[in-house]
Structures are given as C-alpha cells and as structure tokens.
C-alpha cells in the first residue's frame, strides 16, 4: 500500500425509495446493489471497517452474509429525503462511540461514503484514496461526465467528520457510472458491468 490509511466505509441502504421500490435491493448482474457496494468496499486494502446504515430488516439479513460488516439502525429522522452527508455524520459521531474499545474511532483516518445506487462505478477505491492523499484534499466527491456531483463515492478526512466541521480543500474525480433511478437505469448498469466497464464488487 502506498499510504498509511485506515478508512471506514459507510453504506447508506434505506428501503423507503420513492421512484424505484426498494432500490438498494434491486438485482444487477445477479446481486443486489447493496451487495455490489459491500463487495466493492471489501476489495479495498485501505478500508478496514464497513458499516451499513439502514432501517430495514431485509437489509440486515443480507449483511449477515458478511462476517465483517456492521449494521447500524438508522434513526427515523434520517429516512425519507435526509441529506446523505447527515447520514454519514450520524454514523461517525454517534455509532462509532460504541466501538471505541476497538480503537476504530481513533484509528480512522478517512471516511468513505459508498451509495449503493451506482453499481457500475468506474474507479478503484484504493486509487481514489491514493489520489486524495497525493493531492492533500480534505474532501473528495465523484462527478459524472457533465461535472455534476453524482454521490457514488465521498471521501472525507476523519477529523472533519468527527467534529462535523467543514472541510477546506475539496476535490472531485470523474466516475461515469449509472445513477440508478429506474428500471432502464438498472439495465444500463448491468450492461456496463457485463462489458467489464466497472469496478463492481
């Protein structure tokens, strides 16, 4: 590994989607989008801990297939249209206090937010973390081919997430993946994965 990184992945996986029912549990290339995200995180050498935040028993059952994945019950006020950054902050600032005995909270150098509805993401997460450190960023988010933030990946220095303060040096990286909102999007994402045009889990 190029850098001394102890990253924690947070995967938001609610099931109260409005446009596509139980979106994060939709199947793409034989796996739910949630499973793609978990396995994407597990392929990283830098990510040492994975937490799925959800209100769903169904999601919890899927996570039981992965011994090293923790599940955090998402509070009701962070369902519906809550900002995903607030979901990330909630996990780090509240849930991580439970794990202090395991030193995860203190060891963490970076938080990696992985949204499941981008199953055909095109970047290797460890390459992104190397890019983040090499460019001395405090915060990094992915954008689509038009330069619009797409939410696929969000990397933030742990010190900012712990304190809930604003980061200063912000960067972006292209991730020309599918932002799934419909059945057509599911088909497009699967096509991209089958063509080998992704770092899918």
Task: Kindly give the residue locations of the regions a language model identified.
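Short, well-formed alpha-helical segments that are part of the catalytic scaffolds
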Residues: 20-43
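Residues at the starts of beta-strands that form the adenosine-phosphate
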Residues: 6, 48-50, 110
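N-terminal nucleotide-binding beta1-loop-alpha1 segment
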Residues: 1-21
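Conserved N-terminal catalytic core of the sugar/cofactor nucleotidyltransferase
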Residues: 36-106
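Conserved core of the sugar-phosphate nucleotidyltransferase
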Residues: 82-90, 94, 106-110, 115-184, ...
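Short beta-strand/turn micro-motifs composed of small residues
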Residues: 13, 54-55, 115, 143
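Conserved SAM-binding loop
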Residues: 26-27, 52, 113
């Amino acid at each position: 590994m190029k850098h001394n990184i102890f990253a924690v992945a947070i995967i938001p996986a609610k099931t109260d989607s409005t446009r596509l029912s139980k979106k994060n549990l939709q199947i793409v290339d034989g796996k739910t989008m949630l499973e793609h995200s978990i396995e994407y995180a597990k392929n990283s050498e830098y990510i040492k801990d994975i937490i799925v935040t959800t209100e769903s028993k169904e999601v919890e059952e899927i996570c039981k297939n992965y011994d090293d994945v923790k599940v955090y019950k998402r509070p009701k006020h962070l369902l519906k249209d809550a900002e995903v950054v607030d979901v990330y902050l909630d996990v780090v600032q509240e849930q991580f206090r439970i794990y202090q005995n395991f030193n995860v909270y203190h060891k963490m150098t970076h938080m990696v937010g992985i949204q499941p509805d981008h199953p055909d993401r095109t970047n290797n997460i460890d390459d992104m973390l190397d890019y983040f450190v090499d460019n001395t960023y405090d915060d990094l988010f992915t954008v689509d081919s038009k330069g619009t933030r797409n939410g696929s990946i969000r990397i933030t220095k742990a010190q900012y997430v712990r304190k809930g303060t604003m980061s200063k040096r912000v960067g972006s990286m292209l991730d020309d993946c599918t932002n799934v909102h419909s059945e057509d999007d599911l088909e497009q994402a699967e096509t991209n994965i089958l063509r080998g045009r992704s770092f899918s889990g």
